[in-house]
């Protein structure tokens, strides 16, 4: 009886390990599909900032998508392990007993494979290499905006800076440098063609993104400060009372120093990802987000 219980525990542990290995892989694939950006810097950042305003449907989507696939994949792997000797036409009892004996090792192997996949997917090796590598790029090329002399010879004018979430040049057709046969952003393409367009090529190429500039708040920080948004694993939590990149100097601070009143507007919760902290601390922005619009009855539902 004791031996039977030991065998049962062995199988349970092995099955759980295999399932966890599958869940790690499917969760990574789900994350790539849902959020598109797959960098360790982004994960570290979002672990340290407020997640207020996150749609709870995201967690449900993960559960519905990742868990069933992991169960099916894990079941197939378990079935394959116990029947591999039959598939290979090696009807040997010793092979069958050996598989059962080392079943937990098979589960551990699944975990190892899933971790290797995670290392490759998030380029963890590249991240570690960048962390330990010394560079003098900032000493050589960074210009401190707080020391720059700014003149308003033609008078001061309002500045409107628009961010389009999840809009990229690939939506244009190949004529404009996009990736589609049909141009899905014809008006934006024409605006870029007829006006100043910052691009890395002769078409609507946009800028070359580097690590720490790809997700929403990272893009805003990099465009306002000229630096990527990167946090150390050892850095403190970025809550409402934490200084947000205290050494940086942004466009908002330049404007504030020259008498401008800054305002940031968005259709979501500005606390998400530390967005409101960034704008409040770097330019003393008035924050107007979905919550404030709702509170002041300014949404389209209130009209």
Give a label for each model feature.
Residues 102, 121-303:
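Soluble catalytic regions of membrane-associated enzymes that act on cell-envelope
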